[in-house]
A protein has these predicted regions:
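Outer-membrane beta-barrel translocator/channel fold
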Residues: 1, 151-183
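Residues on the lipid-exposed face of transmembrane beta-strands in outer-membrane beta-barrel proteins
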Residues: 2-10, 61-67, 110-116, 142-146, ...
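Short loop/turn motifs that connect adjacent beta-strands in outer-membrane beta-barrel proteins
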Residues: 6-17, 68-74, 119-120, 149-151
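Structural signature of outer-membrane beta-barrel domains
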Residues: 7-9, 24-31, 82-86, 130-134, ...
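Transmembrane beta-strands of outer-membrane beta-barrel proteins
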Residues: 15-23, 73-77, 123-125, 154-156
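Outer-membrane beta-barrel translocator domains and adjoining extracellular loop/strand segments
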Residues: 31-38, 87-95, 136-142, 167-175
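Transmembrane beta-strand segments that form the barrel wall of outer-membrane beta-barrel proteins
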Residues: 120-133
Length: 183
């Protein structure tokens, strides 16, 4: 993560202008092995060792410009690029499944947020919307916090979203006949 301050609030300038960027890479692996088929799970496609491996690699690049002043509040505008590669290696049932199937989603999102305190009210808005790519999800979060007497407050929250794809549902395969999504 990096943050650069282009201008800072002082007696002449009315606000702060910052640039922020972040690069994140994650690699996840899951391995399931069984020396032989277990009758508890029902019938299987083949009566041999089960050796499944699942891999998820994610590259997440985020950049934003942030402006903060007493009059306007805090405004952020940015872009997020996500590259997900998800694959399954299932060695026991090559004849039944296409093990070469790989999910490779590359998506760019537009991010915007706004925060402002007006007397006893805090207003927070966050949005992330699909621009182009494979993952057509978006979300909008809003929050209004009202300060009441003493240490009490009242919060109203609203969220609307279209979710990201469930990679497990899209790709999941099992050696057991009853544990596949498309039976």
């Amino acid at each position: 993560d990096q943050k650069f301050s282009l201008s800072q609030k002082d007696s002449l300038a009315g606000g702060n202008l910052d640039v922020y960027n972040s690069i994140y890479f994650q690699e996840l692996k899951y391995k399931f092995q069984q020396s032989s088929v277990n009758d508890y799970f029902g019938q299987s496609f083949v009566q041999q060792e089960i050796n499944d491996k699942i891999f998820l690699n994610t590259l997440n690049i985020f950049g934003k410009v942030s402006y903060k002043s007493d009059g306007l509040g805090a405004i952020d505008l940015g872009l997020r690029y996500i590259d997900d590669r998800y694959r399954l290696e299932n060695f026991a049932i090559d004849d039944y499944l296409d093990n070469s199937k790989i999910i490779n989603y590359k998506t760019t999102f537009l991010n915007a947020s706004y925060k402002k305190r007006i007397k006893k009210f805090d207003l927070i808005l966050n949005a992330e919307n699909f621009l182009f790519g494979d993952n057509k999800s978006s979300k909008l979060d809003s929050e209004l916090k009202i300060d009441l007497k003493k240490d009490n407050f009242l919060v109203f929250k609203y969220r609307i979203s279209s979710t990201a794809p469930n990679y497990n549902h899209i790709l999941y395969r099992s050696n057991y006949e009853k544990y596949n999504w498309d039976n």
